[in-house]
Amino acid sequence: MRRILLLFILLFLCERRCITCVFFLNFVRMKLIADSGSTKTDWALVDDCNHSTLLKTQGLNPFHQSEEEMFRVFHDELLPQLCGNIREVFYYGSGVRDDQKAKMECLLRKVVPGLETIEVNGDLLGAARALCGRNEGIACILGTGANSCLFDGQRIIRNTPPLGYILGDEGSGAVLGIRFVNALYKGILSDTIRQDFEWSTGLSLSAIIERVYRQPLANRFLASLSVHIHRYLDDSKVRVMLTDHFRQFFIRNIAPYHRTDLPVSAVGSIAFYYQEQLQDAAKQEGYALGKIERSPLHALIEYHRSV
């Protein structure tokens, strides 16, 4: 009962940032957990009672953004939403390479001073921890892009390079969008599907070519087309296309691990919305699926609660 009362007081104070509130909140220890992509970042503020408050900011990617741009996001968007005595930060993000971890840690310490623990890792380790916990397994990201790894329960021990949507990225939303457009305009799919797609999206072949070849972020545009495929799952050719798309992912990205004994788990919108076809592809290639999650954040909250 006392914990419930403390929780309600905490929620009330988070909304009213007065001097008394700040004094009280300094006694509440918090963890801050982030799952960051290039377009948005999902944050979870977790208190001692294991209550989570979910926050959002725009995306962060140290590969594409300057320190000044990222600090502005931290300072202007994240900081006003924070409350409590944050002692630990666990950040998982796209574009985080080993040579950029120190830069991200420094920026976070400027925004959240006095941290006892700070971890900055790539999104693939975040996916592995969310999907496998502390167990051995194969973890995958199937969203706009695709990635995978062999995880030993503590660290990533192997990674097949995805190579991006031009050279690879089998299983991704971007490559699925390419295959869908190809099938629409080369007569593999019916005129009925093509006409319905053009009517519902307002896109023509010339408009698609303009977006892909003459405008930036073609991968995101192509991935956005993949969501429309869900409307045509009653068509056998669409289902075959999807299953083959995922089979290529297993053949080119998962087979090099030589671990058919391990479950293959995946996070991301493509894995989540096309689970049935992903399951069919896994079965055909001799793999068993494990967990499928749309987002890793809630599983990461559970992972760090038990640390």
Locate each region found by the language model:
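Cofactor-binding loop segments of dinucleotide-utilizing enzymes, especially the Rossmann-like FAD-
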Residues: 94, 123, 269
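Polybasic, low-complexity association/targeting segments
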Residues: 90-97
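ATP-binding/phosphotransfer module of carbohydrate and carboxylate kinases, centering on a glycine-rich
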Residues: 25-88, 131-138, 181-307
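Phosphate-binding/catalytic loop of phosphoryl-transfer enzymes
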Residues: 97-189
